[in-house]
Amino acid sequence: LGVLAVLGPRIGKFSSSGEPRKIGPRNPWLVTVGLFLIYTGFWGFYAACNIPIYDLGPEYGMEGVTYFTATNIYVTPTTLSGITMNFLMSLSGGLLAGYVISKGDPFWTYSSGLAGIICASAGNDLYHPIQSLIIGMIGVVIAYKLHYWVERRFKIDDAVGAVAVHGYAGFAGLVICGFVLNGYPSSGYSVGAMWDGSNYAAINPLGMFIGAIIMFFVLGMIPGYIIAKVLNGMGKLRIPREV
């Protein structure tokens, strides 16, 4: 979003009166194949976030007991089948919501599948499958509506919907997670894990909102804006209009 604010819209995206024009993908079939490949890659990312073998015995107070299990990156026990189920439910919810809200637009339908996955990612290992389905649908509605509102209001040309799918849906997913999973432990290795011997904070709405602000704005939008400004000043950000 920070880069797009500096980059500006494509030539012809907005009329002389400022109204946005719809510029569809050049090759809808290639878009379809590409997004299906992204689904597959995202599932691979999910699988890679699981530590295959981990002895949780000592960390759960079971001294002398060996308890091997898969865990997520926060050392919370999980299963590949469980996260795959929620992955597919959020994908399905996203596809359904995208088809309905975009009135069958293929680009938005398939992009919404990815938005659904991303929106439910924050609590994927803890959500009930129906929660994943519903959260995926909610994320798509938010991403779709925000995309067109930002486009009209700020003249931001998000050509491939990346800001909507990853940014708006991702931010919403973190905030939703804080409410749905309020009180759940943030890590399986939370007891006495802090430097002073205290525990990690449990999942809560305020913490997730602050985390979303840090992730998307402090680490994302602001650095992107600064880098784009520097590149633009050097004449390296966009191909000259004459070209």
Task: Label each region the model flagged.
Residues 1-243:
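Glycine- and aromatic-enriched membrane alpha-helices
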